[in-house]
């Protein structure tokens, strides 16, 4: 069973952190299969690193529950099951609903301007049918909400959820057919901010996460 940690991708990160993000992605995308034995030398060659950062990354992956160490046999891939992803979505929904409630109550004028600008970019790139840009902007929209909640631990948890969940069927979620639907879901969330209604924000976020789960998990 996947064990959640606060590890997230960081731009310009140290080698071990960047390596960890790459290995997480390879496991979650199925490049490294559940049950597969990890051969350290092969991974050192694959990622262009020495054994020290590789072992640091493996220890963190073990803490996350993505790999397991078996005495006298080495590391093996566990990965994440469909059920693990579904469970994570349930947790994410609860935390996102709390985050948006607090964010609407606590958002600053500057953060509100950033949220409005981000939503306008979502409208623009939906019109352009640019799925890659929407992937980035969607994450940014939610990140502003996390920061506006003024709860550092909640922000770290939700940022980490995003870093894992984005690997679950991203090609389905960001098909052109879904872009207008995504936009309208975020429009409802944004309207709750402009109306100053935490209740509407919680409801809009619940609908959005439920639909996101359906799109990703089926």
Regions found by a protein language model. Give the residues of each.
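Positions in alpha-helical segments
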Residues: 75, 83, 101, 120, ...
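Amphipathic alpha-helical dimerization/coiled-coil segments
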Residues: 95-123
């Amino acid at each position: 069973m996947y064990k959640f940690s606060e590890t997230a991708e960081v731009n310009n990160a140290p080698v071990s952190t960047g390596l960890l993000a790459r290995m997480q992605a390879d496991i979650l995308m199925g490049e490294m299969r559940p049950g597969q034995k990890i051969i350290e030398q092969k991974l050192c060659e694959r990622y262009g690193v020495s054994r020290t950062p590789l072992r640091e990354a493996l220890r963190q992956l073990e803490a996350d529950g993505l790999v397991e160490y078996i005495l006298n046999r080495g590391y093996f891939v566990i990965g994440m099951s469909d059920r693990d992803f579904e469970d994570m979505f349930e947790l994410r929904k609860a935390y996102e609903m709390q985050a948006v409630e607090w964010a609407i109550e606590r958002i600053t004028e500057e953060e509100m301007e950033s949220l409005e600008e981000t939503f306008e970019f979502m409208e623009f790139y939906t019109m352009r049918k640019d799925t890659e840009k929407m992937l980035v902007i969607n994450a940014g929209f939610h990140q502003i909400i996390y920061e506006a909640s003024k709860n550092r631990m909640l922000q770290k948890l939700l940022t980490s959820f995003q870093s894992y969940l984005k690997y679950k069927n991203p090609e389905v979620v960001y098909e052109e057919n879904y872009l207008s639907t995504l936009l309208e879901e975020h429009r409802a969330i944004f309207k709750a901010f402009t109306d100053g209604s935490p209740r509407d924000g919680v409801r809009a976020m619940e609908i959005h996460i439920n639909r996101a789960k359906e799109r990703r998990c089926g």
